[in-house]
Amino acid sequence: MVQIKQEFIEEMVAHAKADLPNECCGMLAGPDGKVMKVYRMSNVEASPFRFVMDPGELVQVDTEAGENGWELLAISHSHTGSEAYPSDTDVRIAGGTAGLWPDVRYVLVALMDMDDPSVRIFAITNDVVTEEPLEVV
C-alpha cells in the first residue's frame, strides 16, 4: 500500500489543472511505500491524450531518489476528460516500463469534475489492472 500526504494529493491536482488542456505527468518516490516527494515532470508530448516524460528529468529523479535511499513508488499522470482509470494506452505503456520498475504503481488524476477531482492508484501487471488502496494521511 502506498501512503501519501494530503498536500501531495493537492499538489498533483494543481499540476493537472495547471497543465490543461494537456495531460501532466510525474513520479512519486520514498521509502517503504511512503511518498516523500512528488516530482513534477515535463510532458514533452504536450498532448491532451498522452504523456511522455522528459528523459533527462527521469535520470535526475532516479538519481535523487537513489541518493536518498528511496524507491520510485509510482508514475502519475492526469486524464483531462475521462475517469481515473488506466486507458488501453496506459496499460500498454506500463508493460514497457515493467523491466525498469517492476513494482511501480500508477496514480491517475481525473479532472472530469474540476470541483471534485479523482485520484486513484493502480498496479498494472501483465496487462491486468488492479486498483489498490491509497492511504492519505
Task: Name each model-derived stretch.
Residues 1-72, 83-137:
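Conserved beta-strand-loop surface patch within small alpha/beta domains used
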